[in-house]
Swiss-Prot record:
Oligomer and partners: Binds to the N-terminus of tropomyosin and to actin.
Taxonomy of the source species: Eukaryota, Metazoa, Chordata, Craniata, Vertebrata
InterPro entries for this protein: LRR_dom_sf, TMOD
Organism, as annotated: Homo sapiens (Human)
A GO molecular function held by the record: actin binding
Protein name: Tropomodulin-2
Length: 351
């Protein structure tokens, strides 16, 4: 089922992009480059040969045709003759011929084991099934599948077939891939802007084709929304501008209690903006920022630890610290905040 915005994009399929770009001025082209940098900061959607920007503004000194150059190089390579060997190869072998040493054959000596008379009598009178069970308990699994042992047991039983005591393994349960996120981005954004009371949780996880401006609109809509309590945008290719937009939202929003921005492209700059915003927020109790594309660094982790020590409302903080100092401080701060909530709950129950 095609989404509404996908239907609108169909009318742009037959547009000549080269003609449109040729009509743009230099200033308009620079503005377009800035917009593309915001949409794709890592240039992951471009081929590897086009990710490097121009390093100079100088005009070309002569015409350059890449296809013509490749054809010329290929033609020159085919026309040039191979260089003849000055010293022909005669096949003469020099030096000693490597002969591997023969390893001595190891012979195993059987150790004689003497058992108690009671054990020998018990083993002599044991049935084949009991011997199989004993071999399984002792871990002698090669004995269970040994054909010689099967022949001996069959002969001892008067020509009957061997006893099979094979443990069958459990069937492997198939693991199916998770279905795509069914959240409709446009409808959710419209509901948030309209402050729909039925929308209390928004889940945009793993939707990788959401434009950066649309994610900013979500943050802008949360500034005035009074019903959404949980918002999650993990693995949506969000970057620092998105994190800064959500930081501005946290300074104003008084309803949101949980925010998840894990597995994105946010650097220390965006995380520091969120940390500063949490100092002015009184409602958020859970935030997850782990698994970003690059490590945040010691300075950012120390700022996070200081913020959590001063914030008594955050009960869950999703981040794996790389340094022992900030990790210990954050663990103590989170434990203290949860103890305060527990004490308030106990006092309320007593009343």
């Amino acid at each position: 089922m095609a989404l509404p915005f996908q239907k609108e994009l169909e009318k742009y399929k037959n547009i000549d992009e080269d003609e449109l770009l040729g009509k743009l001025s230099e200033e308009e082209l620079k503005q377009l480059e800035n917009v593309l940098d915001d949409l794709d900061p890592e240039s992951a959607m471009l081929p590897a040969g086009f990710r490097q920007k121009d390093q100079t503004q100088k005009a070309a000194t002569g015409p350059f045709d890449r296809e013509h150059l490749l054809m010329y190089l290929e033609k020159e390579a085919l026309e040039q003759k191979d260089r003849e060997d000055f010293v022909p190869f005669t096949g003469e072998k020099k030096g000693r011929v490597f002969i591997p040493k023969e390893k001595p054959i190891e012979t195993r000596k059987e150790e004689k084991v003497t058992l108690d008379p009671e054990l020998e009598e018990a083993l002599a009178s044991a049935s084949d099934t009991e011997l199989y069970d004993l071999a399984a308990v002792l871990g002698v699994h090669n004995l269970l599948n040994n054909p010689k042992f099967d022949e001996e047991t069959a002969n001892n039983k008067g020509g009957k077939g061997p006893v099979r005591n094979v443990v069958k393994g459990e069937k492997v349960k198939p693991v199916f891939e998770e279905p795509p996120n069914p959240t409709n981005v446009e409808i959710s954004l419209q509901q948030m802007k309209a402050n729909d009371p039925s929308l209390q949780e928004v889940n945009l996880n793993n939707i990788k084709n959401i434009p950066i401006p649309t994610l900013r609109e979500f943050a802008k809509a949360l500034e005035t929304n009074t019903h959404v309590k949980k918002f999650s945008l993990a693995a949506t290719r969000s970057n620092d501008p998105v994190a800064i937009a959500f930081a501005d939202m946290l300074k104003v929003n008084k309803t949101l209690t949980s925010l998840n921005i894990e597995s994105n492209f946010i650097t220390g700059t965006g995380i520091l903006a969120l940390v500063e915003a949490l100092k002015e927020n009184d409602t958020l109790t859970e935030i997850k920022i782990d698994n970003q594309r690059q490590q945040l660094g010691t300075a950012v982790e120390m700022e996070i630890a200081q913020m959590l020590e001063e914030n008594s409302r955050i009960l869950k903080f999703g981040y794996q610290f790389t340094k022992q100092g900030p990790r210990t401080r954050v663990a103590a701060a989170i434990t203290k905040n949860n103890d305060l909530v527990r004490k308030k709950r106990v006092e309320a129950d007593r009343r």
